[in-house]
Amino acid sequence: MEGSGTEQKGSPKCSFLTNSLLCHENRQRLWRICNFIMFGFFSLAAYVQINDPDAEMWIVIYMIPAVLILFVSIKPDITGHVIWKLLADLHSAVCAVGAIYLSGCLYFYTSKNILHEEEGRELSGLLIISGWLLLCRKSHQSAIGAIRLIIAISVSTAPFFIWIYIYIDKEMRTSWPQHCKTVI
């Protein structure tokens, strides 16, 4: 209704065909969907660690962001809560330290594609965790902008494409350790 005072000045009306990504409600909806997709990714990543020799560590590493991101997909403003920020920052720091360690190992001991090495796949997972938690970090402070949304859509779909590539590449599967060959 025009003139009712309920419209926000400067924000386009929501409609499916026009301005769909520019509308605040649609950007917020896409942001929540991306977070739910990442919840699924982190949960699935935790599940496939079952056969890993150090499964306990990797299940925890993936389940912490899965739970944090599930909360974001349900209530995006949770990122402003001090406990959410503390857990996300602490976990990001731990993942960053692990990523630095694995990067060093890969740099000095690997000559192949890093995705062919278990440490390379672990490094990728740690970087995705840190990157996604960083992307969520200040999302409560302002409306989800187009750049953050484009990054979110790209990052939330990329792990699944990487998994498909890794799963389809027969050469890569031959170099997998035995515990990786019996998962999904």
Swiss-Prot record:
UniProt cross-references to Pfam families, sorted A to Z: TMEM220
Subcellular location: Membrane
GO CC, alphabetical: membrane
Matching InterPro entries: TMEM220 (IPR029377)
Coiled coil: none
Record keywords: Membrane, Transmembrane, Transmembrane helix
Keyword Transmembrane helix: yes
Keyword Lipid metabolism in annotation: no
Subcellular location, principal: membrane
Membrane topology: Multi-pass membrane protein
Transmembrane segments: 30-50, 54-74, 82-102, 121-137, 149-169
PANTHER family associated with the record: TRANSMEMBRANE PROTEIN 220
Name of the protein described by the UniProt record: Transmembrane protein 220
Organism expressing this protein natively: Xenopus laevis (African clawed frog)
Protein encoded by which gene: tmem220
